[in-house]
Amino acid sequence: MKKLKRIAVCTVIILICFLLETTIFQYLALASVIPNLLIVVTSSFGFMRGRKEGLFIGFFCGLLKDILGGDLIGFYALVYMVIGYCNGFFSRVFYDEDIKLPLALISASELVYSLIVYIFLFMLKSDFNFWYYFNHIIMPELVYTILITLGLYQVILHMNRRLEEEEKRSASKFV
């Protein structure tokens, strides 16, 4: 029952972030870029819950992006899966009181995501203007994502703490 509740909460978080990214933040674009909320969700669950959950959350975030806005089905799912899985390696050194590690990991994830998108969606189409892409898309999106992360991460952290407390309470009833 608790696992089902965690799945439902994660699904709601993913859907809300996707809807915010594709609706409201389209109107709040700065320098024609929007924050990547799904990277924040994928990275956060990766380093909070581990590699396996980071992989699954990343897959569903990427698949949602593929189905509702991508050119290639599976491209974003693969990219987000790898990012979630790699963030899961840091679950052992994650302390929820310290925000420096989450900000660094989310920033690195956003940078890796943007570089992969550039390489596979632009450079392979003979668009070699990397510095223009870096200065006008990657860096503004990175800064905007970091600013939004300061608030969104706290919400995700609070939800994760509540779910973990409920899981611990229900586990202690059976012992």
Residue ranges of each PLM-predicted region?
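Terminal, non-globular segments
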Residues: 1-175
